[in-house]
Amino acid sequence: HGLGQNPDSWNRTIKETKVSESSVGLSLSEMLEGKSATYKELYSSFSGECDKENEEIVLCGLSLGAVLALNYAIDHPDKVKALVLIAAQYKMPKKLLEVQNMLFHLMPNSAFNKMGFKKADVISLCGTMAELDFSDSLHKVSCPVLIVCGEKDKANKKTSKELCHYLNNSYFHELMKTGHEANIEAPEELAIVLQ
């Protein structure tokens, strides 16, 4: 899921798909409990969860979840059977993250409750992501990749299309009349694409 979401954000999409009984929805906030709110710590926890699986895995992530999934597929190409990246970035847009963090500073603490994060943790996490750039490592991804982006997701559509160009064995699908949170805005349409 994305930073402003939780695993329940996927319920409507999952209900519409034939998801494996062994599928798991991870909570990003729970993965950081008791740890520093940094991308490195979050990725370490995410990797640990993925490493628990004995067989190849299919990873599906939106926004921050897509960044984590892509990072894992780069580091463990033999472990990832397929990837679904929704509203994905492979090189963090520094200016956009700066603006986002400025807005986070202005928002009340209560606005962060549904995320499961404290305001300071969200600001810290976003700050540590500014330098992420997987451009030189994309060639390591060896599995099939479905890249999905909403038609109205101006911040991610261009990059998602670029990512499709850079990854071998990838396919881009644009969800019409949909913005950034495809799993919330168009769960039925997303479920069809995921089948």
Enumerate the predicted regions with their spans:
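Gly/Ala-rich beta-loop-alpha elbow adjacent to hydrolase catalytic centers
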Residues: 61-69
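Flexible "cap/lid" loop of the alpha/beta hydrolase fold
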Residues: 70-75, 80-110
